[in-house]
């Protein structure tokens, strides 16, 4: 039993209806032309018989013409009547198929060809005048169209029967074809249900020999891969965020317990525990801000407000502020002499600079020397930030832009890092079609190069 709402049912019904309509229309066109052809044949046959009768009467005298002579000139289901010029019947044919119909003829203005019905049977009537030396009168031929009507009715019957038969055949073919056509979709649906039940580890592996469904399967598998990757990233994000939040909370809890136990009576313990707790709260606040920023890293870039930012001026402004906060650090700049401007959201550009400069300062506690350079080459703007601190091992360089990744977790925590800064920076740069490269030697230097195309 086919359900009415299924694609198979709709496909079968549509194709069957189209084929049925096409066949019926084709049959009607054929019948129309056949009717005209058969009718013309009937008229030609009747006109031929009428001409034979007229020739017979004109070639002989009426006294030498018998009813058998008239009958010999006629085809089946025909009747001939001879009238004089006053409309008086003189003679009529006689055969086995006697036509019991005598039309009323207006001999004053007779119609040459007319059709009349008698007892439901149509007749073709041909009236021709006869002019000869021996006779003046009229010949009336009565030609039955009953056979013609029977043939036409038979044609309609055959057309309907053929249409119905063809419809059933097409319905069967459509059912088989629609079954084969929808089989891959049914299989895909079952596989999808199984994947929903068992998880994303099962991929949809099915070859249908149809380009469209094969493309659909490939697209579905790609989508499943992306969803699986997204779920894994989400799970990893929750785990990493929980871990990053748990550690400072545990530290705060420990010092609060310490204050509760000894801090009330010991001002030194109270002071130390409060300072450490405040530091951890600042760390949590920064982490939460960066986590909130991560939720916005896929915001439509068209929704941001752009302006033409002078890169060199912006770098000088940031360095001036940082020198006031960190007078013990040296900031060396090698800025392009050519003016460098970029259409970018100013807040994002400031954030980008602070991430890399802050990162350089964290991991260069000894030399305290930060170098910043800009240049324009091949219509590409590049910004280089270099520190001479701890450096990044080669094996870690490909992972440093991953979320929550830190080269040395214990040392990173002591520096105040949480592994989100570089991840956020890369997202910002990628929004503007740029990219970031890193070059580093352990205990020598680290250079981050930001390139905007």
Swiss-Prot record:
The EC number(s) this enzyme carries: 2.7.13.3
Location in or out of the cell: Cell membrane
Keywords: ATP-binding, Cell membrane, Kinase, Membrane, Nucleotide-binding, Phosphoprotein, Transferase, Transmembrane, Transmembrane helix, Two-component regulatory system
Gene3D superfamilies: 1.10.287.130, 6.10.340.10, Histidine kinase-like ATPase, C-terminal domain (3.30.565.10)
InterPro entries in UniProt: ArlS_N, Bact_Sensor_His_Kinase, HAMP_dom, HATPase_C_sf, His_kinase_dom, HisK_dim/P_dom, HisK_dim/P_sf, Sig_transdc_His_kin-like_C
Sequence intervals crossing the membrane: 14-34, 157-177
UniProt keyword annotation of Nucleotide-binding present: yes
Function field: Member of the two-component regulatory system ArlS/ArlR. ArlS probably functions as a sensor protein kinase which is autophosphorylated at a histidine residue and transfers its phosphate group to ArlR.
Protein name: Signal transduction histidine-protein kinase ArlS
């Amino acid at each position: 039993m086919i359900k009415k709402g299924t694609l198979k049912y709709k496909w079968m019904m549509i194709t069957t209806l189209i084929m049925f309509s096409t066949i019926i229309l084709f049959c009607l066109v054929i019948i129309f032309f056949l009717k005209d052809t058969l009718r013309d044949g009937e008229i030609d046959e009747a006109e031929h018989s009428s001409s034979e009768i007229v020739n017979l009467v004109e070639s002989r005298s009426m006294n030498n013409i018998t009813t058998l002579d008239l009958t010999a000139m006629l085809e089946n289901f025909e009747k001939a009547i001879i009238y004089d010029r006053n409309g008086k019947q003189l003679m009529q044919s006689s055969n086995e198929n006697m036509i019991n119909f005598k039309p009323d003829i207006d001999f004053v203005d007779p119609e040459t060809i007319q059709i009349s019905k008698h007892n439901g049977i149509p007749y073709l009537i041909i009236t021709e005048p006869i002019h000869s030396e021996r006779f003046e009168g009229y010949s009336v031929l009565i030609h039955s169209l009953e056979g013609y009507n029977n043939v036409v009715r038979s044609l309609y019957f055959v057309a309907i029967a053929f249409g119905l038969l063809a419809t059933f055949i097409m319905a069967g073919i459509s059912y088989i074809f629609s079954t084969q056509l929808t089989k891959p979709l049914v299989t895909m649906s079952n596989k999808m249900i199984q994947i929903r039940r068992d998880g994303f580890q099962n991929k949809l592996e099915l070859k249908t020999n149809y380009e469209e469904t094969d493309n659909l399967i490939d697209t579905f598998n790609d989508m499943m891969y992306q969803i699986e990757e997204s779920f894994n990233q989400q799970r990893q994000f929750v785990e990493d965020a929980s871990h990053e939040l748990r550690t400072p909370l545990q530290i705060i809890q420990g010092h609060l317990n310490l204050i509760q136990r000894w801090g009330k009576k010991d001002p030194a313990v109270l002071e130390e525990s409060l300072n450490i707790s405040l530091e951890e709260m600042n760390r949590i606040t920064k982490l939460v801000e960066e986590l909130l920023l991560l939720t916005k890293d896929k915001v439509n870039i068209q929704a941001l407000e752009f302006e033409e930012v002078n890169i060199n001026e912006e770098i000088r402004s940031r360095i001036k502020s940082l020198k006031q906060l960190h007078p013990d650090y040296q900031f060396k700049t090698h800025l392009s002499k050519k003016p460098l401007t970029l259409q970018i959201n100013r807040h994002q550009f400031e954030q980008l600079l602070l991430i890399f400069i802050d990162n350089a300062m964290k991991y260069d506690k000894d030399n305290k020397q930060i170098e910043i350079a800009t240049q324009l080459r091949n219509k590409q703007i590049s910004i280089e930030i270099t520190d001479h601190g701890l450096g990044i091992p080669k094996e870690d360089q490909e992972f440093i832009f991953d979320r929550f990744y830190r080269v040395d977790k214990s040392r990173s925590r002591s520096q105040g890092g949480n592994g989100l800064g570089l991840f956020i920076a890369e997202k910002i740069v990628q929004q503007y079609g740029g990219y970031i490269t890193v070059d580093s030697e352990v205990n020598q230097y680290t250079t981050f190069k930001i390139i905007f195309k």
